[in-house]
Amino acid sequence: MSSPTDAERVNMRREKHPQIEETFEEHVHNAMPKFKKHYALGITTHTNDEDDDPRDHRQRGIHNPNFIHSPNDPRPPLSQPIKPRFSVHGTASNASVFSHGDIAPVRKTSRAGSLFKRLAGKKSTTSLLGTEHQQRQQQQSSNSLVPAAGLRRKMSTFIHGGSGSQSNESRGTRSSIFFPSTSNSRRGSATSTMTSGSRSSHPPDTPPITSQQQEQQYDQQRQQRPETREQEQKPPTLSDMPIVSRSPSFFMLDTDLNNLSDITNIISATPKNTESDEVRSTGANKTLKYPKPPLSSHKSTSASDLSHHKAQWTAPESWDIEEDANKLLATKRKAKHHHHYHHPQHPRPPHRKHYSNFSKPIEDKAVVEKEQEPPEKCPQPISTDSNDAQGLEIAKPIDESSGIQHSASTQSVSSFSSGATGASGATGKQIGGDQETESTISTVGEDEEVTNLRSIDSEQTDDTSFSKFDEEYDKAEYQLEKYYNDFSDVDLNRRYAIRIFNIDDTFTTLSCTPNTTLQDMMPQLKRKFNVGQGSYQVSLKVGKLSKILRPTAKPILIQRRLLLLNGYLKSDPLHIMGIEDLSFIFSFVFHPVATSHLNYEQEQRLSRGDFVHVDLRNMDLTTPPIILYQHTSDIESLDVSNNANIFLPLDFIESAIKLSSLRMVNIRASKFPANVTDAYKLVSLDLERNFIKKVPDSIFKLNNLTIVNLQCNNLERLPPGFSKLKNLQLLDISSNKFVNYPEVINSCTNLLQIDLSYNKIHSLPVSINQLVKLAKMNLFNNRLTSVGDLSQMKNLRTLNLRCNRVTSIECHAPNLQNLFLTDNRISTFDDDLTRLRTLELQQNPITSMVCGGNYMANMTSLSLNKAKLSSFSAELLSKLPRLEKLELNENNLTQLPPEINKLTRLIYLSVARNKLESIPDEISDLRSLKSLDLHSNNLRMLMNNLEDLELTSLNVSSNLLTGFHGSPAKFFASPSPKLAKSLLFLSVADNNLTDSIWPLVNTFQNLKTLNLSYNNFVEISDLKLQNLTELYLSGNNFTSLPGEAVQHLRSLKVLMLNGNKLLSLPAELSQLSRLSVLDVGSNQLKYNISNYHYDWNWRNNKDLKYLNFSGNKRFEIKSALDPEGKNDLSDLGILKQLRVLGLMDVTLKTSKVPDESVSIRLRTTASMINGMRYGVADTLGQSDSVCSRDVTFERFRGREDECLICLYDGKNENASSGHKISKIIRDIYDKILIRLLEKYGEESDGIKRALRYSFLQLNKEINGMLVSVEDGNTDSGLTSADLLSGSSATVVYLKGKKIYTANIGDTMAVLSKNNGDFVTLTKLHVPAEREEYERIRTSGGYVNNQKLDGVSEVSRAVGFFDLLPHIHASPDISETVLSYSDEMLIIATHKLWEYLDYETVCDISRENKSQPMSAAEKMKDYAISYGCSDNITILCVSLDKSVNQQSQFTLNREDLISRKNTFEDTVLRRLQPEIAPPTGNVAIVFTDIKNSTFLWELFPDAMRAAIKTHNDIMRRQLRIYGGYEVKTEGDAFMVAFPTPTSALVWCLSVQLKLLEAEWPEEITSIQDGCLITDNSGTKVYLGLSVRMGVHWGCPVPEIDLVTQRMDYLGPVVNKAARVSGVADGGQITLSSDFCSEFKKIMKFHKRVVENQEPLKEVYGEDFIGEVLEREIHMLENVGWVFKDLGEQKLKGLETKEFITIAYPKTLASRHDLATKNQNSSVLNDDLLFQLRTISNKLENILSSINGGLIESETPGNSSIYMTFDKNTKDAVITKSTESDWISFLDHLVTRVESTVAILQLRQKLQGGLELYTSSDSTMHKSVFELLDEILKIQTDQKQ
């Protein structure tokens, strides 16, 4: 065996001369583990002799030491019941399964170890693979994962069944034995790469070959090497471009085989297609004949919904990355001579902001096919080798051309230039392969690629918005992967510092270049640590796990990559960071070579067991303990998970003759574990969370396998041998890299469940119908665009297609019961699924439901949330007789049909967040209904006969209710009001209820929760509900709380009375012994707490956890003793259970206030910070601890213009933990930031840099404390439970007029503006976000149930030590300059944003802009009324220091004062009331939708939804800017404004809002509503296009007697209407009068701004000046551009009008597009008149030939009818509509065609054209005579 130095020498030689083939000895050496020489056992070569004893072909001792995992992983199912300690800790996908099936007979010689080997074998039963071949397979497996830029190079040979690394090397002397390694002889060695499977070398330099040539070569090789069959199935190499997990997977594998009654009632059916089995069985010599082992698959390290507790770091493949580093660095040196080289500044991590305009991925199959191509296009061969003509659509890379910004960086990712990358791109050279591979950019399969793309494009609907977003989405994936996997910017000559620890915690620091190997460092380390000449090694420790590094590892590159994964940037000084202690992230440890052994505790625990179910997790083992060898024959289940270097020798496997369940979870394996295929009796095999790239074909030998779990690996295909696993019932291959459906599994006809989620599968083959027993299939989060026929899958019960790109589904599965289609692109659904019970169609652009099919007959649950429904079909309701659950939230419904009473079995009905104006009385017929949610609608009254329902829960919050139909007397008169007895939860918050409703409320005697917040109640004395436990009365007009009413509430636990006008609290509150939450904030409390006989004192309410007095500015807490003089009545410390105490603005004259601690949050500050008002509101929810911490620093650093506002939200999977971290952060963060601000300076870049480093430093200090906890130190107060605790953080630093915001996690900050807009200052960091998910998977993590590693709800946080480096603390940073329009800053924890959208939050803030405390409380109360029961913290800061001024003005004081108080809409009610109708000079605006008639005729349902969106935008902006809605006619609005500025800013803002709205898919799919961008990529048109016209004048006002609204009459109105008629869609036309008035105002404004003249002097009155100046500021924030259209003739008006067109500044390019379209229009006026002239001239010629009278006329006279004069043209143009022009064009074309036809007829029959005069008319033939001649000729020809 050669030394490592020799090996490197060989590799260097091979890199220069790739034709030199690797020798057998070299291959064996490089495949061996380099740190345990005694593992090098015997190696034998397999033959293809079927009769050979499998024992002769085992691989002894060859293993992969690259594995690590976490504790408490779920165990796989076993064949027999097991002990509880081998229990499940996770979701159903990993639940224990007890199978009592028969076990295959034991062989004569019980070599149980060979069972392991079967999993490492190949498919064919006629051959067994040799060890050398397995090594080659593993080498190629490591090669199979290449970056996007380089993937084309390997596709040429992989796609058509070649080895994938077929090259000149294969021509060597041993080519018949092995396929050559791609580049490096160590490629298949024990240690893999650290590149997340995305770096591997490229094929050596070979000329491109065609697929036919490949097949011929393949067949020749096949004949020479029958044992290398698995190699011939090598999949194509595609780059790793993970997708983001958008929702949790609720479809996990149900692994309980003892309880499969629901899915094992197999419906007998013969597979429709049995050809596949025959093909597979006859494919012994040509692997290409197998139907579809997925020969081409993109890498998909998508988040898997795994369910493991305390997951440890799962690094990419291995921590040892020297192999790829060697290639990358070598490639970099060579790449400098090519155009493909990227400048080091280019690779930057992407930033989500670039894509924030898109709410979800949108479909385009062309983009799907080009999914992973780097920025530069190049030919990508695709596989066409399939026996199934309707097979897989092999995906191809997408063109990626632009860079995006890294979330933690202020710099942008440079766009990739085509010249810099060429066909394969720099990434290919930087990340893998030798120099020689540069020329092997294959052109094989180009024709197939083009054909495939064309076929795909032909299927795809032309939706540019879908296409654009899909392209951006896929591009971002490539950029993210490239950032972490790119070594091109590494300076090979630069020296990097690295700290290496000794086992006694001493350390030394070395300075090395990046390519320094561990072997090179060893002499220095031995000298530094003064050790002898013994054997030493270095381990990398991350979290609790250690990985031994190979001698050829490059620690500098490992350190660099780990730093990047932990949030540091390439622009940071990474070369000197190794000087610092980085053990809070990772550490290198120098220690002697020693075999693993159990400590005493572990050995005792193991010896106490029965050795039947053996648990060896987390023991840092390299081999099984010696003690196990004495009991191997008893072992039935073995769990060796989370042992980074574990290897199971063959002798151990041989002796474990009963082994039926094997778990090797997270063992860091990049190759399939050796010897596993020798465990012949295995029933359950769990290899999840590794980096396995290839399953050996010999897995067919494990024919007893029932359960296989391979989720979260790097698989791109499955081997043909998989088809032999006939007993397989449960298969989980989620979170892998499949682009094509692995068709080989269709031969496993006993499969019951398959999980294929989190891959990138584009289509399902027809052969899937062979799985006739399959009951559950999970395809969550793939790239499917359609689902075809599944009619042969007779037993399919559940199909999960959430988060795909499905536009149509016609599966026809006869027994399908559960279909989940959330977040797709389905606009209509009409599949024939007669047994369907559950249908999820949430977040689909559905505008109507088709009622034609029978799929609803058995349906019990239907979800249509977040669709585009504007109506619900009555016919549809009649077809849902068994429906029990119906969800229609967040649509545009205005009413429910009366036929809803046909849903007689309905139990749950939710129609929240719609526009319902009434509820049909027929709903009272639903006697089974238990839960009714109607919150956030426009209901004024509830239905009749409400008392007949038996509801337990009713939520009608945020409506316009003033009462119920009928009277309470009618309700009482009911013989037995069922509702009074059944109702338990009632929420009627945010309505217009008054005290008259109390008698009705009191009838609900069993009520537990009552929410009457934000109504108009004044008295509460009539409330008598003894069973009430929660009472919410916030935001009413209570002035007192009667003690009599309180006495009846003995069971009360929660009482919310904030936002009232209470002066005192009754002493009877002390009798509520169970009271735990009391909120009386923002009242007018002023009473003596020592007068406890009459007023409330808290001393008897010992269970109080939440007590809030904040906002009571006149309330005093004074020290006073009780009559006995023993106790201080002001002592708040007696409340031992207290968690939150709010005393903001309260006067404290006592010292008996508890100190803030980990268990209590205390607020005692004033509600002012730097002159700005601020307020805080929070609730504990169900938590028993204070998880959230807010803190403000006024005059931060002692400076008047600075303040710091922070909000921290503790996180932990255990609700009782996580609060300690947030408290520690609160105490130390400000000091860290002060220190770094001093270091980096006061400039903008310095501040942002200080903020970023402050978070990283904070994480260092927190994790440093957690490290000490790991070592047994508890001085910090933290415990081991906090190792999985962390905290989100949002920090707002105000300096002067700038706001700097930094955040990690899900605590969001929003800036509300007075113009109705808002700015999101933070970024959401959750695992489901694409950028976050990509980084998680790159670092080796996974996502389960929307939690990172199944633990954290956020992907960035401080803490979570056990999750490093999957989680990090690098913040997103934003910088905002405050403007006049900014009103309020809102910071809140994540639960608020789940229940209230940004728009609602900002509406509330504008409504309460002068009272931020009330705004915060109202947001909290709204969330509670909508159903929130978790903890929330909200912090509001009012930025407007002139809070007492009115925000909206008119020129008339009476108009301002007399704002109306009528609320016709729940949302509008939160805005300013509508202004009174202006009089005098006003601005009249007319609006109209372009081509609305055409759209209504084409898409009536879609237009119904679109019009609602249009009207909402119009009316919302009217309230914000102060306009009066005069009337509407159809889709046209007439609006009046008191000032020109308010009219213009309204028009501009509406145009911008229309562009941002979500329109139905039908509207955006046609030309009139599709996405149009300008040359810079700015969105210019999308959705409905609205024309607007504005005129200024003095119309005649008149009240409409019918509507009682002001109308305007006269010529001013007429002119305004005509001005709007000139506009095109998206334009705002202005009359000359309006422009003149506007210019006058702007001149006044200029005097105020430039000359500083007083408002009264300029405008004549201060009030008017304030109004106009405020509106001008709003206008300047929006921005505007004027374009002169010139004089235009207005229809019906005598004189011309000079028209000006206005555009928002950001949409100025609309003018160029409109002008261009007009000039290039086919139907422009001049062209039509020219065509008429041509027609007339042709007719003149024809008349002359026919002998007409035209020739007698003079040319001058001819022009009279040839062309129109200008006046005639203008008259025609003015009176003609678009349809008139189309008819005119048709008329002219017909005339021209007829004339030309007659001329040609004469020319053909008469031999030419001859002019005749009128006197010669008898000499020429008429046209009818000519036709007679033609008929005669035809008759003669027939005869």
Curated annotation (Swiss-Prot):
In the record, what terms sit under GO molecular function? adenylate cyclase activity; ATP binding; metal ion binding
One Pfam family this chain carries? Answer: LRR_8
For the region Disordered, what residue ranges are annotated?
1-21, 43-87, 126-245, 272-315, 332-388, 400-468
Designated name of the protein: Adenylate cyclase
* Keyword Metal-binding recorded: yes
Which residue ranges traverse the bilayer? none
Query: What organism does the UniProt record list as the source?
Result: Lachancea kluyveri (Yeast)
Q: What is its EC number?
A: 4.6.1.1
